[in-house]
């Protein structure tokens, strides 16, 4: 349980972290979520710089997605989702919560689709090496 909490705190530093972690776990298997906690310039807390690769870009896009949700609080909004025929389906009647879910869904799919770009040298990346971030 402690590991789950640590991963949730490190993963993106905001949002319904447990739900995002669960999505990544369900999509990619045990241990996948902890790979991204401190990855590159944008995974973990903050939006530190230009993405180092496509995997890091997934985190950058996720943070930008959250920033666009001006009438929502992605840091606390819990949402509902399900798995249908192997796909994540965001549900519920609240449009804000559904948008938070869609941001997390897109990130999960992005990680899956860019697994081949994951580079262990960026797993725990020193953020001072990051270049100025791209605007959202």
UniProtKB/Swiss-Prot annotation:
Record has Disulfide bond as a keyword: yes
E.C. no: 3.1.1.4
Tissue specificity: Expressed by the venom gland.
Signal peptide start-end: 1-15
Localization per Swiss-Prot or TrEMBL: Secreted
Keywords: Disulfide bond, Hydrolase, Lipid degradation, Lipid metabolism, Secreted, Signal
Protein name: Basic phospholipase A2 Tgc-K49
């Amino acid at each position: 349980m402690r590991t789950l909490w640590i991963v949730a705190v490190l993963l993106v530093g905001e949002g319904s972290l447990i739900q995002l972690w669960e999505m990544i776990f369900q999509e990619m298997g045990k241990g996948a979520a902890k790979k991204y906690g401190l990855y590159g310039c944008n995974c973990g807390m903050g939006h530190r710089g230009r993405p180092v690769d496509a995997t890091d870009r997934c985190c950058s896009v996720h943070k930008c997605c959250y920033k666009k949700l001006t009438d929502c609080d992605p840091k606390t909004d819990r949402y509902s989702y399900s798995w249908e025929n192997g796909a994540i389906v965001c549900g519920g009647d609240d449009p804000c919560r559904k948008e938070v879910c869609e941001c997390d869904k897109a990130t999960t799919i992005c990680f899956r689709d860019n697994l081949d770009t994951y580079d262990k040298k960026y797993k725990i990346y020193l953020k001072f090496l990051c270049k100025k971030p791209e605007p959202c």
